[in-house]
Amino acid sequence: VLMGSNTTHVVNHTTIPVLIVPSDCRWQPINVIGWACDYKDVVKTTPAIAIGDFVEATEAKMVVMHNNPDPKAFDPELFHNNVMVAEMFKRIKPEFDMVSYEDFLEATHNFVEKHKVDMLLVIPKKTSWFESLFKRSHTKMLAFHSHIPLLCLRSLS
């Protein structure tokens, strides 16, 4: 089991899925898989077949979370990508939860508690070195602060 900066290095530099299991995590069946989705380029980046197969193999329910810090600002692309995710995963019939928090970790923690999520799924996106100076990686934050297993799948592009 890896945790911390070594873990995030592995996640960022490998092409295979990485399962991060916190040291204080106790084994339990996977009944609910939560996906923290940013709804950016979902059709091009989401490994939908792998996710669908995994969810079916575990016989779990999938709940998709999107955190929109400003719910008053209507974004047609956000709505479109929500519809696309529903279409991509129609065989597993995911539930959707649009949350609104300034803090991503708080949003994720409350989502996990509300839906009793057993495993969190993330798809880390490649960012430029310059972008990484100004934007904190959500995957990195979760790797350091999650209390449930975190499955990191490589983005398709």
Which functions belong to the PLM regions below?
Residues V1-R26, K114-H115, M119-S157:
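Gly/Ser-rich helix-loop-strand patches that form or flank binding pockets
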Residues M3, P47, N81, F104-L105, ...:
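Amphipathic coiled-coil/heptad-repeat helices and related helical stalk/stem segments
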Residues H9-T14, D24-M65, P71-K90, F144-H145, ...:
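Short acidic/Ser/Thr-enriched loop-to-helix initiation segments
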Residues L19, V63-M65, E95-S100, L151:
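General small-molecule cofactor/ligand-binding pocket signal
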Residues W35-Y39, F96, T127-F130:
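Conserved short-loop catalytic and cofactor-binding motifs
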Residues K44, Y101-E102, S132:
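A conditional alpha-helix N-cap/helix-loop micro-motif detector
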Residues V63-N67, L121-P124:
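Short beta-strands and strand-loop turn motifs
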Residues A73-T127:
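Glycine/small-residue-rich hydrophobic helix-like segments
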